[in-house]
Amino acid sequence: MESFATSDKLFESREFVKGLEELKKRREDGEMTCDLLWRMCRFCHELSTTMSGEQRRKMLIEGRDYGLEAMDLDPSSFLAAKWTAIMFGLVVDQLPTKEKINDGGRLKDMLDKALELDPTDFALLHLRARFSYTIANLSWLERKAASMLYSEVPKATIDDALVDFKAAYNQNADWIENLLFLSKCHLAKKEKQQAREMLNKAIVLPAASSNDAQFVTECKSLLQKC
């Protein structure tokens, strides 16, 4: 089997387009392995961060589908489980509330499975926390509408979200997005001092991307409410 040294080097050097093209060529030539597919999923994730709108949506779906194929080939692969859950979550995040709830149970199962394989992965902890945060913030009307369409509406609380956001923080204390959502949980619980602490940490961190810059702006806005 051909190694992934070249594609991994392209990933490390952030040559994501070239790396994905190389792996697609290998797939077209008949290679179909879990290790190939989760790497394709990972490249799609990185490329999606440079896109917006419909282009980003299509890239997320493409990556999610590679991940699902990888999981079918090897359900015990942590990296396949991790990247599939991440991409599945990003796709679900773009759906309207009803569809988001419908796919939420499947996403939660994916996250739980991946975290069983590695309970310390901060990206997965953050994503599961985001799921809990979203469910906890559904309005009564949204829950009622969902219960009429689906057999079971997922249950989660702000405290559930806070546990996972804190666990992610313990693994990566300088993640602006996680600090933002930690502060939102504390604000929801009327814990303004803890929220201020997280927000003040976030606004002095360097923004590594345009998304980070937006999160910093939101953190500064939330500070006004503390």
Swiss-Prot record:
Coiled coil: none annotated. It is found in: Cytoplasm, Cytoskeleton, Spindle pole. GO terms for cellular component: cytoplasm; mitochondrion; mitotic spindle pole; spindle microtubule. It holds the Pfam family RMD1-3. One of its GO terms (biological process) is mitotic spindle organization. Disruption phenotype: Defects in cytokinesis, spindle orientation, chromosome segregation, osmotic regulation and merotelic attachments of microtubules to chromosomes. It comes from the Eukaryota. Signal peptide: none annotated. Its main location: cytoplasm. Acts in chromosome segregation and organization during mitosis. Interacts with air-2. This is Regulator of microtubule dynamics protein 1. It comes from Caenorhabditis elegans.
